[in-house]
Each structure stands twice: as structure tokens, then as C-alpha cells.
Amino acid sequence: MDKETQMMLVPQGSIEGYIRAANEYPMLTAEEEKELAERLYYHEDLDAAKKLILSHLRFVIHVARGYSGYGLPQADLIQEGNIGLMKAVKRFNPEVGVRLVSFAVHWIKAEIHEYVLRNWRIVKVATTKAQRKLFFNLRKTKQRLGWFNENEVDMVANELGVSKEDVIEMESRMSGADVGFDLPTDDAETETYSPALYLEDKSSNFAAELENENFESQATEQLGAALQSLDARSQDIIKARWLDDNKATLHDLAAKYNVSAERIRQLETNALKKLKSAVNF
């Protein structure tokens, strides 16, 4: 992978600058995309893979915005989505008859969703116990029931001890319908735009409401004690990445400690594992 692609897969500096740079890569026509996909699929052409990836970065950004309400760093959401995009490009079969973005959106969302599930508890220790219970139980409940009707909303609310409004809000957040992400055809009679071009977070106020909740004393004490058990550098990384209002990027901390961004990620991952094993909520 060349330096340009590596830099665009890991947002650095201001997120606004990254988005501007991503939007400068032109979108592909169906014919251009098919040609590049065939070169990659049949001949393992890495230059074709690069062009496919860079031309779809803007779609990752739009999908990542749909998860902004959880308070996680936008740069990290985008980076996780980019991992999903790379996996999709690698597996894309140009003979299937769909556009790459329709195939890739599922991989992009899967990577971001798993990232949210891995990290949301530590970030949102201030939320109510009922909200945490809902977040981590709703997915398995939905696997059993599918999309909820009114009676099922009542049942889930009673089962998890939360309000019906919370169930509906969380279901909307976690299970938004996947609509077509293809670009309009050239012969479209009216000027329309792909949902991927205007997809945005429809319920970002959800996290803002949660942030106004009072800390539960037990969870706060547990987290405080767990943080104190970490070494000074790990404490600083967790606070800077997850607890401060102005969250630092991996590259910010890499520069501070004169190590690579990957090393900071490793330290962060190890620290989060220790916190999760120490905090019971």
C-alpha cells in the first residue's frame, strides 16, 4: 500500500481537512468502477484497488456520521469504516451486478458497529444502568424478534426495565434499514442523489441527553479505581482519548510520547481491556 493510501485510511490532523481531502477524489462511473474491479479481481491489480478505495472514502465518512451520537472520536469511526471498506474491496466480485458501495456499506457498518460495541461502555459510564442494559441487550433481542411492532416494544421495555421511547430510539439507532447506496443512473429523469450523499445522524441528541444524566456513584468509583491501577502513560491516553471533552487523536498522542500511532493504539487497547475487566456494569 502506498503512502497516499495509508495516509487517507487513517485520518490525521483536523477532521475537516481530512473530509475535504477525501471529497477531492472523484467518484467513479459504473463503467470505470467495473473496469477497476475486474483488474483487481482477475489480475490482483493493486493500483486498481487503490483507486476503488480512495474514490469511496466519502461514503465511509457519511456512514460514520450516523454513529456520531455515541461520543466516540469521529476520526476513529472513520478509520474503522475504512477497514470495512478495504475488506469489501478485497472481496468484491464485479460480476455480481451491483455497485461496490451497495456491497461495501454492510462491511463498513459492521466494522463501525463492532467498534461502538467494544468501546461505548467505557465512554458512557455516566449513563443510567437501564440505558446500558438496553444497548447491550437490544441486539440479541432483535435477532430473535426482528423489527419490533408495538406489542413487542412494550414487551422489550418491560423485559429490560426501560421506557418504550428508549427502545424505539435505540432500535432506530442500531437497526436503521439499509437502503440502496448506488449513484443515480445517467438516464435518470430527475436529479436525485444517493442516500450515501446525505446520510447523517438522525438522533445525535440521544447521546447529548445521556451526557446530562448524573453519574452513578458505584460505576464512577469503579472506573476511578480502575484508572488508578493503570500506569501514568496509559491513564493519560485513556483520559485524552475517551474522557476529555476535546479528545486527542492517536497521532496527537504519538507526537507527545515520540512513538508511533500504532504503539499508542496498542497501549490504548491494553488499557481498555484492563478497565473493562475491572468495571462491573
From Swiss-Prot:
DNA-binding region: 250-269
Motif interval(s): Interaction with polymerase core subunit RpoC: 76-79
This protein's name: RNA polymerase sigma factor RpoH
Predominant localisation class: cytoplasm
HAMAP family for the chain: Sigma70_RpoH
Protein's job: Sigma factors are initiation factors that promote the attachment of RNA polymerase to specific initiation sites and are then released. This sigma factor is involved in regulation of expression of heat shock genes.
Organism per entry: Haemophilus influenzae (strain ATCC 51907 / DSM 11121 / KW20 / Rd)
Family: Belongs to the sigma-70 factor family. RpoH subfamily.
Sequence segments annotated as region (Sigma-70 factor domain-2): 52-121
A single Gene Ontology CC term: cytoplasm
Example of a GO biological process term: DNA-templated transcription initiation
Region of interest (Sigma-70 factor domain-4), residue spans: 226-277
Pfam families documented for this protein: Sigma70_r1_2, Sigma70_r2, Sigma70_r4
